């Protein structure tokens, strides 16, 4: 018990940082329960309602549609707000949507529920856009760079543990309660977990003073008195197109390739496991638990590997390793195969999940994080939107197995691109 306490409350951590770290660990613990229950089984629920590949992809694409339009305004808004308060209130607003999933079986038929879920996720995406940009900025401001690898590693361990427990528990509940009552219970557990995660985010405070800089909107061209030129400059300043003139451009482009390859396959996984492999909810819960068990084991070694390899190379090789999962799924025929590929996929994701956020933060100026993260958020959500809608379409045209193999090859190429040009 003492060793566990020391793992999460390392006495070497300076007192001014310890409180933030503990709340970040509890935040991700509750988020792991949310992810392993409501979020993990949302598309499975939609598939069991009879959702098409397009509708399953749409559930992932809806928040991306919002983020494409709101990421830059969200980044500009966050520049003017206390980042801790902005993260808390956007978390509150976005996570209220999980509660609305619970009564849907009482209100609509199967198709009505599918479209209602799509609309709710669309509305949730509005505050979630600012939350996704703001949390990365809050993490960077509350965790010093020398502690980030350690904190990320522990957060991955905690998330893996809670995800494993909630995935197994969710599969058990769904196998013992009638449809759709079991899913309503799971959505209720997800909402409670989201509320507790948000509660702990409230206590995370920035410790690092941001560097004071002149706002891009305040700078004017003193060699020109043209009002048109000033307006045009302010317009470009608001969009922060200047970021595309920096070395960060290469990072955004390689991540566009990675996330596109990643999200092309994700909706197809649900279709393949439910309609081709005919897995039960317990099978799916066990598979995801095995996936995160290997994420957990990989995370315990993350700090040591990162110290020798670095975030950049670790991200690239992790993405290359992620190509195994879709290719192996295309060759699977039963639950045992699904369990084995889940184990392999978990090790690959442990590398990427631990490294890529820190890799991004290393490439971003400390005094301009929100705007750079907003552009990354646009890249991410463009990939989510395209991949989530194009993946089921291409897999339906090519065949699910061939589509998964091609998507795996694209992941491999994306990893090579990160290593070579990132």
Locate the predicted segments by residue.
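Helix-to-loop junctions at the C-terminal end of transmembrane segments
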Residues: 69-85, 174-175, 298-311, 395-396
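Transmembrane alpha-helix termini and helix-breaking/packing motifs in multi-pass membrane transporters
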Residues: 44-48, 102-108, 163-187, 386-404
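Intracellular juxtamembrane helix-capping segments at the cytosolic ends
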Residues: 128-143, 351-364
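Juxtamembrane intracellular "pre-TM" segments in multi-pass secondary transporters
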Residues: 2-18, 208-253
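Helix-loop junctions on the cytosolic side of multi-pass membrane transporters
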Residues: 198-217, 419-422
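Helix-loop boundary and gating motifs at the non-cytosolic
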Residues: 2-69, 88, 94, 99-102, ...
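Structural signature of the two symmetry-related core transmembrane helices
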Residues: 86-101, 191, 313-328, 405-408
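Loop-to-transmembrane helix entry/capping segments in MFS-fold secondary transporters
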Residues: 53-54, 145-155, 281-282, 366-376
